[in-house]
């Protein structure tokens, strides 16, 4: 194998500048940069992924008459009330963690100080999703989880645009 060719391949692999001499010995040269640093740009808030989920959520809301169906079945099904209560508990704990603990009290790692808050929030949110699936199953059948997941992702991506 050719030594200059191997050095060139190594330089390209690790993005060394061509001026840097590659030595076989492990001598540290603090004044010489060892790799070219890439300038990282922050990701844009509105990208193809978030735009797709927001658009899909709008399309699902329009074509399946989501709010009309929700309004008609709200009082006739107790799964909505139970799911709504669980969703309220989940969002209350989440706002407590984000607004009160992180912003007001300044505890950035609240999951370390209060380790049970995140699993309780996750469990209540999943239980609320199951309740909403049971409540709307008689309307959309096996499409219900897909429609609710699309709505959920649209809301999450819309919230990510805000901040």
From Swiss-Prot:
GO cellular component, one term: membrane
Entry's transmembrane regions: 47-67, 79-99, 117-137, 142-162
Lineage top rank: taxon: Eukaryota
Topological relation to the membrane, as annotated: Multi-pass membrane protein
InterPro entries: TMEM128
Coiled-coil stretches noted in the UniProt entry, renumbered to this chain: none
Keyword Transmembrane tagged: yes
Subcellular location: Membrane
Keyword DNA repair belongs to the record: no
Any one Pfam family match given in the protein's UniProt record, by short name: TMEM128
Main localization (coarse): membrane
Keywords: Membrane, Transmembrane, Transmembrane helix
Entry protein name: Transmembrane protein 128
Gene: Tmem128
């Amino acid at each position: 194998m050719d030594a200059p060719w191997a050095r060139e391949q190594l330089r390209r692999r690790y993005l060394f500048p061509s001026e840097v001499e590659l030595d076989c010995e492990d001598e540290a040269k603090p004044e010489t940069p060892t790799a070219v640093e890439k300038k990282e740009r922050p990701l844009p808030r509105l990208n193809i992924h978030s735009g797709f989920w927001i658009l899909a959520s709008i399309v699902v809301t329009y074509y399946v008459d989501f709010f009309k169906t929700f309004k008609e079945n709200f009082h006739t099904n107790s799964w909505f009330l139970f799911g709504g209560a669980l969703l309220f508990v989940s969002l209350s704990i989440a706002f407590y963690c984000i607004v009160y603990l992180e912003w007001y009290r300044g505890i950035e790692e609240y999951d370390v100080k209060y380790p049970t808050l995140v699993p309780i929030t996750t469990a209540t949110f999943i239980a609320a999703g199951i309740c909403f699936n049971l409540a709307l199953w008689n309307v959309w059948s096996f499409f219900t989880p897909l429609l609710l997941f699309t709505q959920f992702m649209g809301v999450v991506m819309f919230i990510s645009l805000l901040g």
